[in-house]
């Protein structure tokens, strides 16, 4: 393995002259007016010893001098405190709590304008068990039965009351990876309030295949009315939350005329033909508002058009062999990603960016919703390693660049576009300082106008992390692992693609994480399966361990008893400013537990009752070997994060965990940080990745004192 630092400004970037200013925290922080309207998110649960632990949100809209009163049963028990959590040693489960907020600390002899939260009762335990309505299973055309388990979740405020609702994707037990044949059950989406009330159910039908790479759903307020919508891919037979076919929400006569009883699955359960559509649903009711053709279609066209040399099958674009699949079986062209991006500025309404392909051709389709209709903003197409183009709503090319060249740090010629550069996830944020979001698409980045920002050419990978990983460098950084030769991992400048650290390896580097786990070093630490131990952000190894490889490929322990920190999700959980980790014990159940870095190794971090996550409510992770939570986000309470797992004893409950560890630090809700909020929106996509902040928390907390 080789490690070195090298400046690499990709040729694709140089040719375009794309060198705007560096992004900063300010540029990735929306104005007060643009922040989600959230309530205090007050939560109470058993304290670590006796009593009740209460926590609540500090908002990004609050003044620097904001302070709080804590009320128990209508009586103030803590007066004008600065912290956003409080332990009531005399509290009990029978009592109720409210938070009174003062934007400026009032004088004792003067009345002050104040905001009073709703009253909450303490949870009975360290987690909340949310009942969910498990769908009935079924039998596939080949006679095999299946049932349902809770899979990925997202959040949005669908009714505008300042509290998030949960949108849950139910996966059938026969969901498939794109590389596998087989029928699947229908994909089902539910919406629940945090008290367990079900608002609606959407059934995407038999013509949407179930699997991690197919249904990518976005939950966000796209039209600026203060209420979140849902956007996802649909097809003939998809039913909205009112039980109506989504095709009836179209303004296109051909979409309205689709045969909703047709079954487009082939004899091995794949869907290679038929209508492909995109639908926006009303978040409160699940009602389909508008449905359009999905772009590009299987034959690279817009709507029902096909690219030159492609053809129709039974009236619809036929899956193209140019996607590059062996035997043309519907793999590479059926891999989707999605994200929410503020392409016109953080204070403007966002776009849905729906993506198709990353092993060869890469397409990113930006779509706007004005409250009534979905409209194309642009369609980016990286059609070869050397050529990219941008098309408008009619499919007309409005910008194109050909003949780009690019070389990797070792001098090998590599892709100069987003062709073959995407990952199993993406990231969104203003990386170039222009006030608009860009899309980090694996080893490449796409500008807010749909043009190519840069490409490192280092290829596809399973994981990437965008944040201010190195607070002493201007702008943001990306850490990514790679699946293809020369494999390995890299740390790069998120604006230019300049390679800061680079490791090569002999095999697929399938896991890697960037997180601030060690307070002795500024910035985030890096670890991945191509490098033994843990590195600081400058590339220095700060711990031995992990594994090393013999020339014949077998691995041996590098330090007896050492294991890398978990290569899954980072999380803010305890009271310090470093990040903890979500780990899993492995097969067959992938049971989750908390982990903390002690400076030399990762150690289990039990809950205050001495138990681990998996010992509470039969909690289990999802997505098989990826072993991810159903959702991780700052849902309520103070700035520490919540994590959701499903109850494997009945698959009919979600377990929501929140911390009860006091902290002295006051930090605005993470959901008011733009990069973090965008990360929660794309978290459910493909191989789920954790959300990251757009700033370095220890520095932010110092400013908030």
Cite the ranges covered by each PLM segment.
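Bacterial N-terminal signal peptides that target proteins for export
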Residues: 1-9
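Bacterial N-terminal signal peptides
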Residues: 9-17
